[in-house]
Structures are given as C-alpha cells and as structure tokens.
C-alpha cells in the first residue's frame, strides 16, 4: 500500500505506467486536505496518461480508395470446403445453399444503398459501389470488414429459414478484399473474369463429382480430369453420364447477379379498393450468360448511370488486369499486428435491444465469449482486450497468418466474431429476440516494438476508464430525471474528481466499487503451459481465459511473459 501522495508521485516518475488511479485502494488518506491532493493527483495522472498514450494513433495508416476508382468488395467463404462437408451440402451444387448466399447478398444491397450491383456463385460474392460513393470515407479496411461482417451475420440469421431441419454446427466466416477498378473498362474485365471462373469451376466440379459418384476415387478423378479442356469435359459429361452441360440450371453455370432497378409496386389501396402503384428502386436477381457484355449492361439504366457504359465486348482478359485484381497489401514483417473491431451503430443496436445503461453485463459477457472463440479459432492471436462494443486482437510478432495479407486477416476476424455473436446470442439473452443482424468494422495496425504495443493497450484501457466514468454519470443523471441534453450540459468540462464527487454525493456510488469488468474492461489470453506437463489448479494449460486486470502497469506483463512470448 502506498502511504502518501509524495511516494506515489515518486513511483509514477520512475515507472512506465502513470495510471495508478486504476488500482482500487492504492492510496491511504488521513485528512481531507490529503484526500484533495490525492484526487488532484489522480486527475493529473489521467491527463498525463491519456496524452502519453495517444501517440499510438499515429501508426494507423490511411487506406482510402481514391476517386475516380470504382470500388468492388469481394467476399469468399473461409474454408467453405470443410463447412459444406460438415453441413452435408449436395455436390457439386447445393441449390438451397446458393439461395441462402443470394438472400444474404440481397440483404447487403438493402443495408448499403451505395452498392449498385452484385455478382456471386458458390461461396463468393462481389459487390460494386456506385462510382461517386463516399461510403466510410472510402476507407478500404473499414468497408471490406463491414461487408464481410454483415454478410456473415445475415448468413447465420437466415440459416434456419433455408435449412429448417439442419443445425448450424459452427460459425461460418468470410474473407474479403477491396478491388479498385480505374474505369468501367476495368470493372468489365473484373466481372468477366469472375464469371469465367464460375463457369470453369462449375464445369470441373460437375465432372469431378459425377466421376466420384460413379465409383472413382478422388485421386483417380483428379488424374482423369488433369489438363482436360472445356470441350473434353463437355464430352465426358455427355458420353459417360448423358448430361448436356448447357441444360444445367443457369444458377450453377452462370452465377447470380443482383442490381437495383425501378419496378412497379403496390404501395396502398384507395377508398374503392383499387391498388395505388408507384415506381420503386428494388433489387432484382438476373441470370445472364455474359454479365460483362454490352447487350446486358447497357440495357440497364441503373447500371450505366451509376457505374458507366461498357463501350465494347470483352474478349481475352488482360493478364495485367488479373494481376491487379489479385494484388494483396501485406503487413510489415516482424511487427506486432493489432486487429481492432468496433460495433457499427451500436448505440442504436443497444437501444433497440434494450441493453441496460450505462453497462449491460450480459452484453459484455457475450462480447467476451466471442473474443474467446476468436482466440480458439486463430492460434496466432495471443491476446485480446475489449470494452463496450470494441475488441483489440494482438497477433504474435512472427505471425504469418494469411501470409500477413491485411484484408484477409481483418475480414476473417471481424466476420468470425460477428457470426459467433449471432450464434451465441440466445445463450446470453434467452428471452430476448435478436431483432436485426449486428455488424463490426475493423482495421489492422502494425506496432514496431513491444513497448509501443503495450502503450497501445494502455491507451485502450485509459479510454475504457474515461468513457465508463462519463457514461456512469450520464445515465445516473438521466435516470434521476434529467433529459439527455441537460445531462450532457451538466457534465461538460467536468474532471475526474468532479465526476467521482457527483456519483458519491448525489447517488451514493463509489466509482472504485463498481464491477471491475466495467472499469477495466476484459483481457483474454491463454494460460501458461506447464513446463513439466503438470498444471496446478483446475484450469487446463493453454486454456483461453477472461480476466479483468490492470494491463497498464508493466507488472501484469512481467508476470505473464508467456502471453506475448517476450522476455
């Protein structure tokens, strides 16, 4: 126990951590004057700490997709070969699963008005934004993670609608990326490339599974199809199985495209019962043999007005175009990568779902459970810190997850977290319906040193304290009868000490006695593996646990060197 403010000041000057105020009961005060000095010092420490740690924001890089480039977000099912096998999808195509994907894409177009066109097949979908879009300030990481996250949430939400007799056994997730197209011509090449891929993959898969079903082994089938051309595959299907490839459902051969067009809808009925109709922009599904053809594209005003005309039909796709479509930005090697996700419009989400204010413990526990699932899913993630509707995930310094491709890492984490959130909702809110799918946006930031990484985590915990203290005061004032504007005005310009006095004097609340989960947030990490193979206590080695601890003081990290494998 620290016995005087002077000693505390000396300790603060000699210590890397300035957030002494986080440690409940760290001060022993014998007089009113000493108490005031202590409170003033706590406030000073808070301001110093906040200004000390905020420099870590400078490591965040801009990833704006510059105008006039067109933005395309492509999502792909993450390890959907396994997912389709576990959930017993029909081979080579499961029509119900494809209809589920299409339904999710329709929800995406409804959720994000800037998305004009979508094309998908199998477990992938491409979403094209209008050329003038300024959605999320055109920040690539935010956009790609948000689309993947929302798609994953809708996929889980709609599962029972399409598979009422089949349980969703684990959370699906999607990787995504932003493809930047410099012109309508480049977009045309991109769409042609994806539809050609749809045809090639479907033709191969149809041959493959027909051979397997006829008794061939997987290796035999692969050998038979090796180096075969399009015509040879068509002949194999017709001669051996009586299948004319061109008569297979368009859904399988051509994929599905979705775009908004004006359609006539009945909006009401007049006093005589006659329908009153209006033209509305509505997303419609179309199957076309050539979605990149002029005859298809230029007949749709909504497409050429928002995305541009196709001036000629495309033949062979330029190899340079394909290389640009496949390009991936990679994170710097041997740096600490932090993926931070934030709830999208969670103020509204918490209001609609009637979360308790200022903190809903069940909602926080749901977030923590999702974070645990993320650590269990991704072995390279060694630590996570969360508060409210945000979570930061720290990858080990040497991680080669997804070859350090930032878009895949961000989207995989964000979408897996989101689908887990939806999947586990009923466990934490058994009597509360999930009224609409949540979504999270994400970013990845590289921190070059261990100390800077710890400063980042300290900054997030400082922010936790500041926000929780303000929100506690705000909602207590609202519950006491003030409206939100009055409460905001009342708290404007108040310092830490004044907020603590408000809580104590007006509401009988001692801030440091509030649940530690609210004040310190949640840390998620694996327990240290015992060197001799024996683990003391009830918890297993390597088990992922949730704790609520002071991660600002370096003593926590010194006691848990195994978390970041640093010494």
Swiss-Prot record:
Signal peptide: none annotated. Keywords: GTP-binding, Isopeptide bond, Magnesium, Metal-binding, Nucleotide-binding, Nucleotidyltransferase, Nucleus, Transferase, tRNA processing, Ubl conjugation. One of its GO terms (molecular function) is tRNA guanylyltransferase activity. Mg(2+) 1 binds at residues 342-343, 389. One of its GO terms (biological process) is DNA damage response. It is found in: Nucleus, Nucleoplasm. Its cofactor is Mg(2+). GTP binds at residues 342-347, 388-389. It is an enzyme of class 2 (transferase). Binds 2 magnesium ions per subunit. It catalyses: a 5'-end ribonucleotide-tRNA(His) + GTP + ATP + H2O = a 5'-end phospho-guanosine-ribonucleotide-tRNA(His) + AMP + 2 diphosphate + H(+). Its EC number is 2.7.7.79. Mg(2+) 2 binds at residues 342, 389. The keyword Metal-binding applies. Belongs to the tRNA(His) guanylyltransferase family. Adds a GMP to the 5'-end of tRNA(His) after transcription and RNase P cleavage. This is tRNA(His) guanylyltransferase 1. It comes from Arabidopsis thaliana. The lineage of its organism: Eukaryota, Viridiplantae, Streptophyta, Embryophyta, Tracheophyta.
